[in-house]
């Protein structure tokens, strides 16, 4: 019963999740995106690893409880030491107002993660201590199990990834409009074909706006009818030809295919 209760609370309490104090700017059209409104995606985190006594951004992630972050399995290296930046906007400002850095307790990588085919590209990071929620740090909503969005449903990818193919990492959080691409379209021969499984979701592919290196693990944010924001995808992979290739939309791990797994891990 406890396991059912915890995830049900994340799903059902729209006022408890996915409602930023500073609403995002949705009037615009990440690569080809724009600077986000500060703290308008307050569940977005920066996953950082320690190298040469310096913390470096490697991936994004989403805070889904006060103690757990959802990210991609391919972001995790068992030999690295990680920390999680929460409430961040500008990565070049270490002591940014409203931000905190959390130590990591445990990282759960999906047991069937396949590095070759990028199947089950999902991981959960348990923080050493629960974080205190605020206007700059909030939890994201999780969609209901099996939830599928229709073709062209407007969603937003967010992150500090490269501003263009082989370009610099973004200093401030970026956002980009990424409409949903149906599985039927995304699995066409001239799109992603058999690389895309039904446990994945595609978005974008217009050749203009896209996620890029450094956005991995971050959220695909989609607004529900009640106005709350749900994380429907985790940035998984894109085209080796570049970050914004026509008919090669970003492929995300579909969160609603993993509700049971998420629920199991947040109980540990």
UniProtKB/Swiss-Prot annotation:
GO molecular function: peptidase activity; serine-type endopeptidase activity
Disulfide bonds: 17-141, 59-75, 155-222, 186-202, 212-243
Keyword NAD: no
UniProt-listed CDD domains: Tryp_SPc
Domain of life: Eukaryota
Name the record gives this protein: Chymotrypsin-C
Coiled coil spans: none
EC number, UniProt record: 3.4.21.2
The Peptidase S1 domain, residue ranges: 30-267
Similarity-based family: Belongs to the peptidase S1 family. Elastase subfamily.
Prodomain positions: 17-29
Signal sequence region: 1-16
Reaction catalysed by this enzyme: Preferential cleavage: Leu-|-Xaa, Tyr-|-Xaa, Phe-|-Xaa, Met-|-Xaa, Trp-|-Xaa, Gln-|-Xaa, Asn-|-Xaa
UniProt enzyme class: hydrolase
Keywords: Disulfide bond, Glycoprotein, Hydrolase, Protease, Serine protease, Signal, Zymogen
Glycosylation sites: 25, 90
Keyword Disulfide bond carried by entry: yes
């Amino acid at each position: 019963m406890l396991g059912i209760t915890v995830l049900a609370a994340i799903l059902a309490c729209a006022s408890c999740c996915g409602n930023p104090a500073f609403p995002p700017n949705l009037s615009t059209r990440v690569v080809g995106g724009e600077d986000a409104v500060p703290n308008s995606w307050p569940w977005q985190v920066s996953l950082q690893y320690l190298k040469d006594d310096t913390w470096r951004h490697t991936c994004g992630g989403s805070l889904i409880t006060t103690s757990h972050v959802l990210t991609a399995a391919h972001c995790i290296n068992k030999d690295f030491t990680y920390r999680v930046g929460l409430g961040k906007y500008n990565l070049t400002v270490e002591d940014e107002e409203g931000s905190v850095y959390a130590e990591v307790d445990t990282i759960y990588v999906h047991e069937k993660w396949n590095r070759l085919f990028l199947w089950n590209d999902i991981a959960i990071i348990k923080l050493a201590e629960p974080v205190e929620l605020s206007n700059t740090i909030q939890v994201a909503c999780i969609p209901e199990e099996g939830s599928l969005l229709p073709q062209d449903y407007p969603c937003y990818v967010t992150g500090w990834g490269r501003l263009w193919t082989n370009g610099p990492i973004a200093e401030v959080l970026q956002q980009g409009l990424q409409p949903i691409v149906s599985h039927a379209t995304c699995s066409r021969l001239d799109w992603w074909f058999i690389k895309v499984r039904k446990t994945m979701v595609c978005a974008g592919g217009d050749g203009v706006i896209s996620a890029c290196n450094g956005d991995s693990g971050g959220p695909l944010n989609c607004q529900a009818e009640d106005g709350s924001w749900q994380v429907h995808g985790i940035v998984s992979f894109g085209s080796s030809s570049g970050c914004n290739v026509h008919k090669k939309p970003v492929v995300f791990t579909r969160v609603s295919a993993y509700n049971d797994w998420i629920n199991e891990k947040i109980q540990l």
